[in-house]
Structure formats: C-alpha cells, structure tokens
Amino acid sequence: MEMLILVPKITNRLYYIFELMLKDELGIDFKFTTDKDSYLSHEGSKLHYGKYPMPEESGLYQQAANILFEHDIADQDVKICNYKESKAIYPVFNERSLFPFDIFAASFYIISRYEEYLPHVSDNYNRFQPQDSILYKMEMMERPVINLWSIDLGNELVARYPEITLKKKTFRFVPTYDVDAAWAYRNKGFFRTTLSLCRDILRFDKNEIRYRWDVLRKKKMDPFDTFEYQIKLQKELKLSPLYF
C-alpha cells in the first residue's frame, strides 16, 4: 500500500528527494496529494509535509523549510543544529514535527550539492573546496549522512505504521582513482623530458636531477607509478575499482 504524502504543492524537488529516501532507500511506495480532505480520510500510512500541522490530523507530521517548494537556485540561510550525537541542518521548532530538522530539505541540499551551484571560490582545478562545504562544517565529511538519516526516517515510520516493510539494503565497496598524471618522469617524451631537465639545471636542483635521471635509467621507480601495488591490493581484497 502506498504512503500518502500531503504537501502544499508538488514540485520536482519534492519528487526527487522523496523518491530517493522513501522509494530507493527504504522501499516505500508513496504518492503526493494537495487535497486535505483526501489526506484526512486516508486510513493507511500517511505523512503531512508542510509549514504548519493541521489540528485535526492523525498522521505523522514533518515541518518543512522552503527549499523543496522553490524552483530557482538561491542563497540559503543554512543553519546547523544538534541532532542525536551529531549535527543536521534546516532546524525546525514545531513540537509535533517528526524530526527537529527538515530531514527532506537537509537531504536535498546535501545530495544535490546545492552549495556548488552558488558563487564560491574554486581550487586550481576549478573544483569546489571541501573546507567550504556544509558537511565539513558539520564535521560529517566521512559519514554516509543521507543513508543514516534514511534509516532514522524508516525507523520512525515503522514505529507509527508497523505494517510498513522496509527494504533490506546490500552494499559493495567500489574504490575510485582519480589519476591526473600516471608518471612523474617517465613516458613524457623527449621534448618534455629535455625541457624538465633544463629547468632543473637552471634551478641548480641537484636532488631533482639525480632522482629524475635514476628513474629514466630505471634504477628507481617513478614516484607516481603505483599501479602494480594497486593491482596487488585489488587482487587480495577482490576489488573492482574505477579509474578516472
């Protein structure tokens, strides 16, 4: 049976994040409605997502921020709040709210990398800098935040509606390697290698000259050439990495 979600209006952002968290993460089918009477008369599982709760409603209520009802990309007043033993964003303050923060707005902001579409200072490779991200400020860069919040959401929904069956998740580890340069000295071609040697000579960089020369004569390994070690690890751990 589908969970009925009451919202003030239906937007693409709503579809995206509810599809991700309810359908993909938890395996819960749902449908939206803007009809309060249909929602109130619905006897199955239901959730009201909006600014204010209705006095007469008997389902679950989650107080909403504005971002999922917007269409343009605009500056957000993203505040950090405490949640359990960690942090969250988009705090809400209605006592009837399922969570003390808008779990859907917060998840959308993070999973869409919304902040990267706003003006920011990029690094030398035109990339968004990690220290500017909201997850860095929340000290949660290395945690699967959306997965953890989805689990919390699922637990709350099942506590209220025991007939809900959550999808069992399976995981696999897929390492990725971003290889900007495969070699530091080797396979650069005669012209580039000669120019680099001339540069080292002009700088009187004896250590660099010696190291480069040893690598070119195959007396030392190229410092960037770690592929044999990577392949060894992949075989030992049975990994199937992706290279970029």
Residue ranges and their predicted role:
Residues 1-244:
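Terminal accessory/targeting
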